[in-house]
């Protein structure tokens, strides 16, 4: 249970960017030791470093000569780097499990790849190097890596190791893959692409020997996480039937494609939406979900953006009037019950209220981001009281002659009282 708590803490801390100091997300330590397995190990390291630099990594540390590889790797891990890569030979140039334990990198946890003999032999060793990278530290004092790819057995071969290693980072950067598991698949795919005839069954063998210690769904940082500014209401009231959000970057520019999710502790409540080109998203609550009973957990996430977390507080004693699609009705021009292009629609929207307060002389205004022509966009409800409140007349609007089939038209009702 202690090891599991450590791993969970490391992954959550990594994904939530608990530590964003020292520009460590821009640092990568790449080793290619040619002393035993040959110059191709150095060339592999140079290739990986070049790919990282091409795709924006600012501080790529490359070591391919000069000895003292083990102490160099200890220093890099201890300082805190985003990527830690080794290509060399059995024994990892003297770098051991003890060296991982000696590091104090905290939540500056790299994605580690140690592609050589014996680093991923989890079935035959008490704790192989890839396991140590994942398990190192504690839940409150982490160290090591957030995930690590290693290679099982002492029978690996240089050319296949090189292909897997290059493919991992080509997948992450050139192919825009996002997770630890995807990067491993990319390494294996590159192996197959380079040796499609599967000579002596080596492709099959190496796709089994290379393995991941960690959660395959861990989203890896390939750039410094962007901080998102999220505008939203801090409370939700009885009767609220939608929540709106606006997401921007530190320069105030909209962030498109951010995933906004809403959750309660109860398992059946989960809603999500993606921000548009203006950074906006509206998440609708249907009737079954307006009966919210506790705070809502808001999470806004996007690749290479720091997640935004917030608890929207549920105000149990405060009720607001609301409209419902289920109780609204409309009349269309040809009375077929379907809104068609060019038709004029009469829309009747009752207002429901579950509280005890009385809202006097209430009016409602209809608006939309869709291409509709409003003929009568304001109606009078009088007093809004507990129960169902009907308007004195319907809203009237017409659809464009060019409206597409099955288009979703969002209508907004703004209530005001004197």
Where are these regions (language model features)?
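Proline/serine/threonine-rich low-complexity linkers at boundaries of modular beta-sandwich domains
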Residues: 217-227, 315-327
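Short, solvent-exposed loop/linker segments at the N-terminal edge
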Residues: 234-239, 335-343
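Short acidic/proline- and small/hydrophobic-mixed sequence motifs that coincide with surface turns
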Residues: 254-256, 356-362
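Intrinsically disordered, low-complexity Pro/Gly/Ser/Thr-rich segments with frequent PxxP/GP/PP motifs
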Residues: 271-274, 278-282, 373-403
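Terminal connector regions
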Residues: 291-295, 300-315, 396-418
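Short, solvent-exposed loop/edge segments of extracellular or virion-exposed proteins
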Residues: 326-335
